[in-house]
A protein has these predicted regions:
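C-terminal motif of bacterial Sec signal peptides marking the signal peptidase cleavage site
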Residues: 15-16
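N-terminal Sec/ER secretory leader and immediately downstream segment
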Residues: 20-22, 26-87
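Mature, soluble, non-transmembrane domains
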Residues: 69-218
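Sec-dependent signal peptide recognition
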Residues: 2-8
């Protein structure tokens, strides 16, 4: 599987540790055939190595290597490394996107990104994934928060006008129903609000579908 171009940042606070999944995908790829790509899930851990024996993996890392594949189908451990003073456990998880991905039944697909018939850019999470996230949260010692961010990249070769973001954070600034344009080769980061995030991460009586933004009508 290859990396995809609409950046998806899915983050957790796992037992108080910051976690993020990052993948980039240009707008042009939303019109491609349905396909699976990989997102990078990075989780902050107390340390990669055991304090007693640096040749051994830490208990926190061992625990994550067991639990993350139980939450995300197809998740694979990649590496554990240090960034300045922080230790990060990195995984890859599959995400599916494409021009017909939302209405197509794909075996094993838990996370999807695509456009509906009204050109709304949506992200969906299956009931099975939401159940696993909620169960994982209940098993965690401290609060388990989930946030989702998207880096939209305009690689269409022209300015894209009249995109609409509803009640979201744009480049980390809170906004409500903002209409904006994207110059050629520009990018913008959108983070879902709490309500949309809960739709993707809690069982509830919802369909697991959240709006990212409204694209201009063709």
């Amino acid at each position: 599987m290859n990396k995809f171009s609409l950046l998806v940042l899915i983050g957790f606070l796992f037992a108080g540790c910051k976690t993020a999944v990052l993948t980039e995908v240009p707008l042009s790829t939303l019109n491609m055939d349905n396909q699976a790509k990989t997102a990078i899930l990075n989780i902050e851990v107390p340390g990669c190595s055991s304090y007693e024996d640096s040749r051994q993996e830490s208990k926190a890392l061992i625990d994550l290597k067991l639990k993350i594949p139980q939450v995300f189908n197809g998740a694979q451990f990649k590496e554990c490394y240090k960034v300045k003073m922080d230790s990060v456990a990195s995984f890859v998880i599959p995400v599916y996107f494409g021009k017909n991905v939302l209405e197509t039944e794909i075996q094993g697909a838990e996370l999807k990104i695509g456009k509906d018939q009204n050109n709304n850019l949506l992200v969906t999470a299956t009931r099975g994934l939401r159940d696993k996230i909620e169960n994982f949260q209940k098993q965690s010692i401290s609060k388990f928060d989930f946030f989702v961010m998207f880096k939209i990249i305009n690689d269409t070769g022209a300015e894209v006008k009249n995109l609409i973001a509803e009640s979201a954070f744009i480049d980390d600034a809170p906004t409500y129903y903002i209409d904006f344009n994207m110059p050629k080769d520009s990018s913008v980061v959108i983070r879902l609000n709490d309500v949309a995030t809960n739709i993707l991460t809690q069982k509830g009586d919802n369909n697991g579908v959240a709006l990212i933004l409204r694209l201009p009508k063709n």
